[in-house]
Every structure is written in C-alpha cells, then in structure tokens.
Amino acid sequence: MSSKSSKRKKITAAQRKEVLNDFRTALESRQASIMGRREVLTGKAKFGIFGDGKEVPQLAMAKFFREGDWRSGYYRDQTFMLASGIMTLENFFAQLYGDTDLSANPDNGGRMMNNHFATRSLDEEGKWKDLMKQKNVSADISPTAGQMPRSLGLALASKVYRQEKDLHSLKQFTSKGDEVCFATIGDASTSEGHFFETLNAAAVLKVPLAVSVWDDGYGISVPIEHQTAKSSISEALKGFEKGKNDHTGIRIFKAKAWDYEGLMETYRKGVEVCRKEHIPVLFHITEVTQPQGHSTSGSHERYKPKERLEWEKEFDCILKMKQWILKGGIASEEELSDIEQKAVQRVKEARRNAWNNFQKPILRKRDDFIKKVNISTCRCLKVDKIDKLLQELARIGEPTRRDIISTGKKILRLICNTCTPQESTLKKIVTKWLNDEFADNQLRYSSHLYSQSKQSPFKIKEVPVVYENDAPMVNGREILVANYDHIFSKYPEALIFGEDVGHIGGVNQTLEGMQKKYGDLRISDTGIREATIIGQGLGMAMRGLRPIAEIQYFDYLLYGLQVVSDDLATLHYRTAGGQKAPLIISTRGHRLEGIWHSGSPLSMVINSIRGVHVLVPRNMTQAAGFYNTMMLSDDPALIIEPLNGYRLKEKMPANIGEFTVPLGKPEVMTEGTDVTLVTYGSCVRIAQDAVEQLRGFNVSVELIDVQTLLPFDLEHVIVKSLEKTNKIVFFDEDVPGGATAFMMQKVLEEQGGYRYLDAEPATVTAKDHRAAYSTDGDYFSNPNAEDVFEKIYSMMNEYNPGAYPVIF
C-alpha cells in the first residue's frame, strides 16, 4: 500500500513556520475527533462523526481555497474548516453539543449534527453579504453524494459570471468568474448516480469544479472491491479524462493521503488549471485511514482485518507528516512533542469553553424557573408533588431545555383550580413562563423554513392583471413567451435551462426565440439529467443569480426530488437563515396522455419539500403572475404549468411581466350556496364543466381554485365559503388520500371548518394506479366532470332527497 514520497527540497524559515503550523492544526483536529467521540460516549453529545485520518490532504486543499471560493462537501472536512480559518475549535464543540447560539454555532444554530458545515451568506435581515470577502461553505447534508448536484451550480455560476460581462458589476458575488467550487466526497459515495451525473455535466459545461475523493477503502463496513469498478474511482473515470485534443473532459490527479509535500504540489497544479482554464479536476486521494471508524455508532474493528488495522497505524497521515518533518530536519523531536502537548491542552480548553457556553444559559433558565415557582404566594393542595418535581430538576447536573419545560408542564397539571384568579399566582407564573419558552424555542428550532426578509413572497405587493378593451385572444404559451421576454430583459441575472429549452424554445414553445435574443448561456439546453438540473439551479441561486430550472414534465421531477427535498427545501431552515437559494423550478403536469405524461403526484411533493412553495396555476396567465411574484421574492418555488393548456385561448394582458399573483390566496371562480367545491390546476376547467351541469339540476356550487398548495389558503377563504354552504368536496387528480386529504385537513381541522358541516365531506380523486393511455384510459383513470357531478348530486340527495331525487 505504501508509496515513495516526492523529492524534498530545502525550505525557508517562513515555510518551516507554515509546516509546523499545519502540523499543529492537524494535531488539534485529531484531538478534536478523539475528544469529540469521548463526549458522545459519556453522554454530553448525542452523536459524533469526524474527519480523523483526512487531516493532511485537507491541509493541502485549504492552502488553495481563497476568498470568494465555495466548498460543497460532507461531514469529514473539519480539518479543512480549521485550516481555512472558517471554524474555531470552540465552534467545533458547540456544534457537537447542538448549541443554538449562532455566535457559538454559526454553521447551523444547532439544527444539524456535528461536522455539518456552512458559512453565513446573509446578514440578520436576510440580505446578501459580500461573498467575495469571505471563504464560502455551502451547507452540508447527510445524504452522501447529495452535495454533488449543488456543486455543479456553484461552479457553473463562475462560468456565467466570467462570460456575461453585464454581471461583472456584481462584485459582492464574483471577481469575473475566478471562483472555484471545491467538492469533497468519500470513495464509497462515488457509487451514487449523483456523482457520475455531476462529473459528466461538469465536463460538458466546462466549469471550475475541483472534486476531492477521500479514499479510505471502505463504505462503513463494505470494502472498495464491492463498491467501485477496478477498485479505483480514478481508473474507473479514465474515459472522462481530457486528452490533448479533447474539447471536453476532466483532469485527474492522484496523491497519497500521508504525503504532505506531494499533496501540496498536486493541489497547486490542479487548482491552478481549474481556476484559470475552467476545467473540472478530480483529486483521487488514496491510502486514507479512519482511526476511529465511521462514527460513534460502532467500532471499525468489527469489520477491518487485523492487517488493515496495523497498516492504518503505520500509515496514519499525521505520523507520516511527523516522520517527514524529522527526516527533513525541519524540527526536533522535542519541538514536535511540545506542539503535540499544546494541541491536547488547546482542544481541552476549547471543549471546556464550548461546554460552559452551552450550559450557562440553560442553567440560568432552570434556576430562574425554580425561583419563580418558589416565590409564588400560592400554596396548592399538591404542593408536596410540586416541590418534589423542583427538587428533581435541581438535582440534574447537566439539564436540557426539555428537562425544564417538561417539569413546567407537569407542575401546571398539579396546580389546583380551587383558588380564585387573584389567588392563583402560581398558575399565572407557570403559564406565562411556558408560553414565553415556547415562543423562544420556536425561534431556536422552527424559524426560517421560509424567508423572513423583506423579499418574502408574502410581502410582495399584488399587482392585478390588466387587459385592454381590444386585448387579443392568444394561445396560452404566447403569454409565457411574452412574460419570459420581460423577465430576461428586466433581470440580467436571470437565466433558464433544461431539456430542449434553448434551441427549439421548449417542448411547448414557451421560450420561442429567447435563446436567439438572450444567448445560449442564459437560455440553455441541458442533457437528460434532472438531479443536476435542480442542483445546477440551486448552486447558482446560492451565488446571487436568479435561475429557472425547467423539469420537462412533472412526472420526471422524481429524478431530482431528493435534491429538492434534502437540499433546496431545507437550506434556509438548516442554516437558521444563514443561506438561501431563490430557485424557481418550472415544470408542466397533470393530465395529458399515458402513464408518464399525465402525472399529478402532488401529495408526494407537498409532503416532501416543505420549504419550497408549490404553485399550481390553472392557466398560463396565472402561471406568468407566479413567475413575476417569485422573481421579486427570495424563496424557492415549484411552479406546475397545466400541461394541456398551452394551446387554449387566453387574453393577452396589457401589463405583461408586471402583474403578480399572491401566494396562499384562493380565488372564488363561481359563487354558490349549496356546496363548496375546492380544486386547482387543470381540474379547474373540469370543475367548471361540472358546475354548469349541476346548475341544470338546481344545484348551486361555489367553485374555489386554491392556486397554491404551499402555502394553503392563508386568509381562510374556503372555510368562509363552507360557513355559507355547509357542504364541501375536494377534487384533484392525485391518488385517494393524497392532496385532497391534505386540503381537507387544512380546512376542517386547521381552519376549524368541521363545525360548519351538515354533510359528510367528500373527495373526488384519480384511481390508485397511474393514468392509462388513450382518451378512454384517461376517462376511466382520472376523475372527470361526470364524477364530480355524481359526487355532489349524491351529497345533495342525502341532504334533501325530496328536492334532489335519486337519478343513478
């Protein structure tokens, strides 16, 4: 397994100082891993995953990471964070303890487990900071390889900034595109499709993406021969390698994890090529060790053979670095021993400081609560039980907020109701204290799912659509063409990409002529690669651009759903408001033809991407209004255009590109008095047909288009209708128990609509199976106007059989 190190040269005093500083950083990082594991095993922390064994290669990578650059990595990169000066040892332990104080844990405010890193791109008001004055780290996620799609967008932004001269003025985001995205990944995770899809796209697009693969030979317990072709990712990727006459491809570099000098030279060469020439590079770092195993969940001694464990001790990168220092006469054994001892003490100090800072506010909170209860003038009948609870709370040496809240709730249950409000000071005290604590903890753990800035879509002024008297009737797609033209003219940072988006102007011609007018960088075609289309948009949005990522059909969003769910939807939340990605995902869906061109799986989406707004316009005018709203907002959104509406006639608005449609505001399409019918998207036209049919049978239906599912009816329009009609039907093309069940829960439970019901609420949905092919297949798979008619008429028959006799 060993390999000869590169030839050594004499070093200067400055270089000596740098080497010893690197050695100190590596030692401190290793000790942080060791002590961090101990904190978990002794119960102070919940879980630990560390970067031991990867210290030396990360020192090298950090040398060439500069202000304005971006990292898109994973949970092994603590040494890189320390060496880059982005994280302190106190930050490391604060993260391990789950400290919610952003000054101590700026990465995520206690919302993610340890070693999940992020820098803060936004100020306290949610505005962009100057990202060129800091080293940037995009927020990590646990799903391995999940960082790869995002890295494509972070790198592609540099290409856009370099080539689009109109964007050179955006100096808080770029220095003419010289920024590199550094991605890191473990060797086992290179087996994920995200990895290959990202590398392929990066090679095709020619972007400055520098990928480091930490190859320690295992994916938890599974050895590399079961993971990777040829047991080597660099060998497996030979076909990607850029030859002398190749137009596209990647450069591949290999180095040993313990070869300090060789690693420095390898990263110097690779990053220089990547930065200057915008060629993706892969650093395959081999012979990596993992001294403590995968995580605190278990020991690697269970699955690694004795020979491997012995080799890992011999080729530990820090030990090898020490031997190299001694052999080169850079420092003496005594000097290195002193550095080692000081590293241990420094990490112990950081651990102690972080723990004290974490515990102090909780201890103060506990003592304050006990004091408040004890000074109460109220003496309840169950005072002995209350005193016992307080004593138990006081005895907890390292309390959590949960301990205090739980005690408060139990005490509240014991307070008697025999006292008058004037006498029962204890109940007032405990109730107010609990309410205040819930409000505080809402901010600690539940804030920033969506934007709270002035650019929140809920703060965007509604601008109604305006029509001239002689407004022409046009195909719906033409409204989108005109609206896109306005967007790309108004916002130089706006761009759109997807399959068939560029050259032919989209499969439904909604971007006709846009590439010719705005260029193939802003209006661009992509390969068939939905996961990285989403990642491409996500990364660019994090760097100040305004991307629109088109997924050709809603059915194919599933390929990219993991990226939306785990990364995009959680970004603002998991950084406690520190990062944002105002990406618009554009797609088209609902009924058309066949299993995979008629999908409307809204329940799958709305239940997996909370944090992304889900907008379901009934026509292209409403869709255009949503695009305009979201371009003014800093939240991400999924806009699902009705697939069968591009050739339907609509009036051309006079204020195209300017009108907006508010989020969470249903529209009453038809007023009625008997039944409330709630739907969205393509189902609106079907519902309108059913309403007309029912009118002929003396049934008055109030038809409501919800317009957006996330958010849903913020003004309680639907429950106000239900208060009038006392009967309600929810209608869509999702599966039974899908989005109709979601809407029902919102209206009946959350809005309290159950109290107005005079009849059992009903749903009209598609079948459990996918929609069959052909007109008849659609008719017998998806709900139609006749189904809606029958459901509502049956409801009226049950309510008043004399007025509405059985007709079926």
Report the location of each language-model feature.
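Short beta-strand segments
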Residues: Y74-Y75, A145, S151, T184-I185, ...
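Active-site phosphate/pyrophosphate-binding segments
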Residues: Q579, G589-E593, H597, L602, ...
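Cofactor-binding active-site loop characterized by glycine-rich and histidine/acidic residues
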Residues: Q31-S212, G217-G219, P223-H247, I595-H597, ...
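Non-catalytic terminal/interface segments that mediate subunit docking, oligomerization
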Residues: V383-R543, D555
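Short acidic, glycine/serine/threonine-rich loops at helix termini
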Residues: A60-M61, L82-M87, G193-E197, D215, ...
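Thiamine diphosphate
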Residues: E55, L59, N136-G408, L643-F808, ...
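Cofactor-/ligand-binding subdomain signature composed of acidic, glycine-rich
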Residues: M1-K46, Y75, L449-K461, K791
